[in-house]
Curated annotation (Swiss-Prot):
Function: Catalyzes the dehydration of the S-form of NAD(P)HX at the expense of ADP, which is converted to AMP. Together with NAD(P)HX epimerase, which catalyzes the epimerization of the S- and R-forms, the enzyme allows the repair of both epimers of NAD(P)HX, a damaged form of NAD(P)H that is a result of enzymatic or heat-dependent hydration.
Cofactor(s) the protein requires to work: Mg(2+)
Classification lineage: Bacteria, Bacillati, Bacillota, Bacilli, Lactobacillales
Subunit structure: Homotetramer.
Domain YjeF C-terminal: 5-273
Protein name: ADP-dependent (S)-NAD(P)H-hydrate dehydratase
HAMAP family named among the record's database cross-references: NADHX_dehydratase
Record organism: Lactococcus lactis subsp. lactis (strain IL1403) (Streptococcus lactis)
Family in the record: Belongs to the NnrD/CARKD family.
GO biological process, one term: metabolite repair
Signal peptide: none
GO molecular function per UniProt: ADP-dependent NAD(P)H-hydrate dehydratase activity; ATP binding; NAD(P)HX epimerase activity
Catalytic activity, EC: 4.2.1.136
Length: 275
C-alpha cells in the first residue's frame, strides 16, 4: 500500500486560472437530507461548497429547505420529491453525491439516479444509499465512475466481509470485482481502486469520531471530483487525505473536532497546497 503524504495535495489541487468562471469548477448535486436528517444534508453540501465546487444544488426534504438556505445561501435547493426538477438537475450535474441523511425508505431516489446516470458523470455513494445498494444487490451502470465511502460496518454489508476479514487482500479482491473506488474508512483509512495499488492514511485523530464527519468527507470527495480532472483515485485520495490532515491539525488544540469547524478550514488548506 502507498502511504499518502502532502504530495498528493500538491499534485491534485491546481491554482485557479484567471480566465475561469463558476462552471469551470463543476456542477454538483447532493441528494439526501430526509425529514429527520437535515443536518447531514447541510454538512455534505457545505463541505462541497467550501471545497470549491462551482455550482452546488441539493435535493432534500422540503421541511429542511429553510434551514439549509439560512446556513448556506450559496447552494440551490430543490424538493427531492419533485422528480421532474430532480431529473433536470441530475442530468446537468458533473457529480452526484447521494446518501447522507437519505433514509432507508428512499430506495426510489437511488434507483432513479442509477437509471439517469451517464458515462460522463461521477457518482459518490455514501450513508443510507450505500446500505440500500448493498441490501438490494443493485448494479452500477458505470462502476469506473463510482466512489463508495463506507465505514467498516457498511463495508461489511457491501462486501460480505466481516470487520476482522477486511484485510488488504480481501478488500482488494472485492473491489476488483465491484469495479468501483472504495474509501474504506477506519482509524487508518484505505482507498482501493480496481486492479491498482491501494493508498493508506497514517494521519487522522480519534477527535474525528463524531457525527457528521463522514458526511463532510463525502462532500469533499464530491467537490474535488467536480473541479479536478486527474486520475479519479488520486483526486479521491487527495480529498480524503486533506480531511484527515485538517482534523489532525485541529486536534492539537481541541478534544473533539466538529465537522462544521473542519469545513471552515478547507479553503485555507487548499490555498496552502495549490500548485
Amino acid at each position: 500500500m502507498i502511504e499518502l503524504t502532502d504530495e498528493i495535495l500538491a499534485k491534485v489541487i491546481k491554482k485557479r486560472k484567471k480566465a475561469s468562471y463558476k462552471g469551470t469548477y463543476g456542477r454538483l448535486l447532493v441528494i439526501g437530507g430526509n425529514r429527520q436528517y437535515g443536518g447531514a444534508a447541510i454538512l455534505v453540501t457545505t463541505s462541497a461548497v467550501y471545497s470549491g465546487a462551482g455550482l452546488v444544488s441539493v435535493a432534500l426534504a422540503k421541511e429542511n429547505h429553510s434551514a439549509l438556505q439560512a446556513r448556506l445561501p450559496e447552494a440551490m435547493t430543490l424538493d427531492f420529491d419533485d422528480l421532474i426538477k430532480l431529473r433536470e438537475v441530475a442530468k446537468a450535474a458533473d457529480v452526484i453525491v447521494i446518501g447522507p441523511g437519505l433514509g432507508l425508505e428512499r430506495l426510489d431516489l437511488l434507483t432513479e439516479v442509477l437509471n439517469l446516470l451517464t458515462e460522463n458523470q461521477k457518482l459518490v455513494i455514501d450513508g443510507s444509499a450505500l446500505t440500500l445498494f448493498a441490501r438490494e444487490h443493485l448494479d452500477l451502470p458505470f462502476p469506473e465512475n463510482t466512489v463508495f465511502t463506507p465505514h467498516e460496518m457498511e463495508l461489511e454489508r457491501l462486501s460480505g466481509l466481516k470487520i476482522g476479514q477486511q484485510t488488504k487482500e480481501e478488500v482488494q479482491d472485492f473491489v476488483n470485482q465491484l469495479g468501483a473506488i472504495v474509501v474504506a474508512k477506519s482509524s487508518e483509512t484505505r482507498i482501493f481502486a480496481p486492479n491498482r495499488e491501494s493508498f493508506i492514511l497514517k494521519i487522522g485523530s480519534p477527535a474525528q469520531a463524531t457525527g457528521g464527519m463522514g458526511d463532510t468527507l463525502a462532500g469533499m470527495v464530491g467537490g474535488f471530483l467536480a473541479q479536478f480532472h486527474g486520475e479519479t483515485e488520486e483526486v479521491v485520495a487527495a480529498a480524503t487525505y486533506l480531511h484527515s490532515l485538517i482534523a489532525s491539525v485541529l486536534a492539537r488544540k481541541t478534544y473533539v473536532v466538529l465537522p462544521s469547524r473542519l469545513i471552515e478550514e478547507i479553503p485555507l488548506f487548499m490555498k496552502k497546497y495549490e500548485c
